């Protein structure tokens, strides 16, 4: 999995974290899986956005956070374990849900990760992903201002590649809206080249041109910025 340094981790908190109000559709989308008394593994927890969200949304659920980057763990200010998808530092059959938010495109060995997921999941457990997939990106407004970033999609897997690579079956797939920013002006003030996999594919000139387009639009357009990421729920093959 990709490892972030201290500068990238700090930028991530500025550029990528979304308010809990903006994420409210995700609370509703995952609620069926976050049952009282269950244990959730936030795998690739980053700076802890969803650790904090789940604590507020689902107070009767235990969340265990695992993150490979020491800088991200430090920036979170939360208790997190060092580990990654191919080596999860948890006992066998210890979690009911594995949550992975914008993580799976960083996983280098899906087969090894799938074996680890099956190991730590209890019978009947599920893997719940919040992600962008190569063939499903029309809901991402970033491409309007940074069209060259589309070339980075080649590094993102398809839904089938994720499910087949991990060795799970698709149980649910749908686009979930989220309010990424209260306005384009807010979005322009927080966008960071180093904090986004898509933007890091841009040259300095491409990034500057895209930010100029974003600022120009922000001067005349009002209203919230709404993007869509996919919810993908995976179950063990056969549903066992």
How would you name each of these model-derived features?
Residues 102-106:
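Short catalytic micro-motifs in class I SAM-dependent methyltransferases
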Residues 99:
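A conserved beta-strand element that flanks and buttresses the S-adenosyl-L-methionine
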Residues 1-35, 49-53, 57, 72, 126-154, ...:
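Conserved class I S-adenosyl-L-methionine
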Residues 153-167:
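Short alpha-helix
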Residues 41-43, 47-87:
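Class I SAM-dependent methyltransferase SAM/SAH-binding core
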Residues 111-123:
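A short glycine-rich, Lys/Arg-flanked "PGG" loop and its adjoining helix->strand segment in the class I
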Residues 19, 47, 172-240:
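Conserved Class I S-adenosyl-L-methionine
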